[in-house]
Amino acid sequence: MQIFVKTLTGKTITLEVESSDTIDNVKAKIQDKEGIPPDQQRLIFAGKQLEDGRTLADYNIQKESTLHLVLRLRGGTMIKVKTLTGKEIEIDIEPTDTIDRVKERVEEKEGIPPVQQRLIYAGKQLADDKTAKDYNIEGGSVLHLVLALRGGY
């Protein structure tokens, strides 16, 4: 089947795939066509970041679906966000990213809107307009995610 991959520059790439193909396979096909190494690719479908080991079928990606390709810049920092259930989400950030941007990354992976997220690091609640660097958040840092219920303070 054919699927489309749209880049940030607005270019659309057409790929021939099977629904049993993994996201890894799709990234390899994008590398063949565009020369972008898979470790620099992030694929988004229906607002979610696609994980390498999963298949197109797992995400219900069908013929003529459009995926969005976002480039992960070199020098990105991998941090972890731990949820109340104990689940750890790995997120790639830049030191200059605002906390709001970090929350957007959490939303891409978990579907939790940024307004419902409170991020805690080193015992402090993080302000949206500050950067990861402002809080000395580095590779391997673990942030804690607390959900803010509507109407709560």
Swiss-Prot record:
GO-annotated molecular function: mRNA binding
Induction: By cold and PEG, but not by NaCl.
Keyword annotations from UniProtKB, A to Z: Cytoplasm, Isopeptide bond, Nucleus, Repeat, Ubl conjugation, Ubl conjugation pathway
Family membership: Belongs to the ubiquitin family.
Organism of derivation: Deschampsia antarctica
Protein name: Ubiquitin-NEDD8-like protein RUB1
One protein family per Pfam: ubiquitin
This protein's GO CC annotations: cytoplasm; nucleus
Tissues and organs where the protein is expressed, per its UniProt entry: At 13 degrees Celsius, expressed in roots and to a lower extent in old leaves and crown. When transferred at 4 degrees Celsius, levels increase in leaves and crown but decrease in roots.
Job of this protein: Ubiquitin exists either covalently attached to another protein, or free (unanchored). When covalently bound, it is conjugated to target proteins via an isopeptide bond either as a monomer (monoubiquitin), a polymer linked via different Lys residues of the ubiquitin (polyubiquitin chains) or a linear polymer linked via the initiator Met of the ubiquitin (linear polyubiquitin chains).
Note: Ubiquitin is generally synthesized as a polyubiquitin precursor with tandem head to tail repeats. Often, there is one to three additional amino acids after the last repeat, removed in the mature protein. Alternatively, ubiquitin extension protein is synthesized as a single copy of ubiquitin fused to a ribosomal protein (either L40 or S27A) or to an ubiquitin-related protein (either RUB1 or RUB2). Following translation, extension protein is cleaved from ubiquitin.
Record keyword Nucleotide-binding present: no
Keyword field contains Repeat: yes
PROSITE patterns associated with the record: UBIQUITIN_1 (PS00299), UBIQUITIN_2 (PS50053)
Domain called Ubiquitin-like: residue spans: 1-76, 77-152
Source organism, top-level taxon: Eukaryota
Species classification: Eukaryota, Viridiplantae, Streptophyta, Embryophyta, Tracheophyta
Maturation propeptide residues: 153
